[in-house]
Amino acid sequence: MSVSAFIRITRPHNAVVAGLTALIGYLIATGTLTPPSLLLAVIVALITAGGNVINDVRDVEIDRINRPDRPIPAGDISLAGARAYAAALFVGGIAIATLTTTLCLAIAIINSVILIVYAVRLKRTPVLGNVAVAYLAGSVFLFGGAFAGIEGLVRNLSLAAITFLATIARELLKDAEDVDGDAAGGARTLPMIVGVRKTGIFAFACACGAVAASLLPFGDWWGLFYLAGIAVVDLVILFGAFRGLSCTTPGCVRESNATSILRAGMFAALAVFAIAAVI
């Protein structure tokens, strides 16, 4: 067992970005950053890392074929060692969360449970798996806001809702892209049940919901600059979802770049919220 393997199995880039996102959530809720708020980044990074490790534990047989270089199939970390490591990361994140607020602690515990349930059962469950991923993405902003109390959490509801709905749209379109591979792997996704076309319609409806959520005046950032900036973001999100709306085949969805456009729209929304919060 090497130190580098224990770092690599956490997907550190993913964990660090999640941690920084929590800080941005606090910034949006309060308009500033404080030294204690750095705890948020550490907590989210640890819990995200734990989720990534438990995912590798559950996917070990698939990784033996598709990703034999991953730490567990490569023999760099044992299954027992990975399970213990994941538990330590979750416990560490929750323990640090006790130093924050009751709201933050509750979200940390709930998200840890969802990450485990997702890896064990929801990952290959149609729609519910997509909803779990979307909730986890949006809840990071609620977690950041919750460090400022219930008022901070409420201020971040719009961004959390945008992220939740846009992520569902993107996850569904990603599933539509991967129908052939998922079928070969024995997965069961929404596009495999209702077809690519109906999945695109549902994804577009979720994108419209994200646009509606962006207009909700929950924070002090709501004003002329925000409305001008979010209008552009909304167009990007709608354009991305619309690109996938007319598709009837996985190849069409891939060629539409709908998922990439939606991801760009989500990052742009985050930038608009952050800038509006500090000006």
Swiss-Prot record:
<keyword id="KW-0472">Membrane</keyword>
<feature type="transmembrane region" description="Helical">
    <location>
        <begin position="27"/>
        <end position="47"/>
    </location>
</feature>
<comment type="pathway">
    <text>Membrane lipid metabolism; glycerophospholipid metabolism.</text>
</comment>
<feature type="transmembrane region" description="Helical">
    <location>
        <begin position="199"/>
        <end position="219"/>
    </location>
</feature>
<dbReference type="GO" id="GO:0047295">
    <property type="term" value="F:geranylgeranylglycerol-phosphate geranylgeranyltransferase activity"/>
</dbReference>
<dbReference type="InterPro" id="IPR023547">
    <property type="entry name" value="DGGGP_synth"/>
</dbReference>
<keyword id="KW-0808">Transferase</keyword>
<feature type="transmembrane region" description="Helical">
    <location>
        <begin position="259"/>
        <end position="279"/>
    </location>
</feature>
<keyword id="KW-1133">Transmembrane helix</keyword>
<dbReference type="GO" id="GO:0046474">
    <property type="term" value="P:glycerophospholipid biosynthetic process"/>
</dbReference>
<dbReference type="InterPro" id="IPR044878">
    <property type="entry name" value="UbiA_sf"/>
</dbReference>
<comment type="function">
    <text>Prenyltransferase that catalyzes the transfer of the geranylgeranyl moiety of geranylgeranyl diphosphate (GGPP) to the C2 hydroxyl of (S)-3-O-geranylgeranylglyceryl phosphate (GGGP). This reaction is the second ether-bond-formation step in the biosynthesis of archaeal membrane lipids.</text>
</comment>
<dbReference type="GO" id="GO:0005886">
    <property type="term" value="C:plasma membrane"/>
</dbReference>
<comment type="similarity">
    <text>Belongs to the UbiA prenyltransferase family. DGGGP synthase subfamily.</text>
</comment>
<feature type="transmembrane region" description="Helical">
    <location>
        <begin position="222"/>
        <end position="242"/>
    </location>
</feature>
<protein>
    <recommendedName>
        <fullName>Digeranylgeranylglyceryl phosphate synthase</fullName>
        <ecNumber>2.5.1.42</ecNumber>
    </recommendedName>
</protein>
<keyword id="KW-0594">Phospholipid biosynthesis</keyword>
<keyword id="KW-0443">Lipid metabolism</keyword>
<dbReference type="InterPro" id="IPR050475">
    <property type="entry name" value="Prenyltransferase_related"/>
</dbReference>
<keyword id="KW-1208">Phospholipid metabolism</keyword>
<keyword id="KW-0812">Transmembrane</keyword>
<dbReference type="GO" id="GO:0000287">
    <property type="term" value="F:magnesium ion binding"/>
</dbReference>
<feature type="transmembrane region" description="Helical">
    <location>
        <begin position="127"/>
        <end position="147"/>
    </location>
</feature>
<keyword id="KW-0444">Lipid biosynthesis</keyword>
<keyword id="KW-0460">Magnesium</keyword>
<dbReference type="Pfam" id="PF01040">
    <property type="entry name" value="UbiA"/>
</dbReference>
<feature type="transmembrane region" description="Helical">
    <location>
        <begin position="90"/>
        <end position="110"/>
    </location>
</feature>
<keyword id="KW-1003">Cell membrane</keyword>
<dbReference type="InterPro" id="IPR000537">
    <property type="entry name" value="UbiA_prenyltransferase"/>
</dbReference>
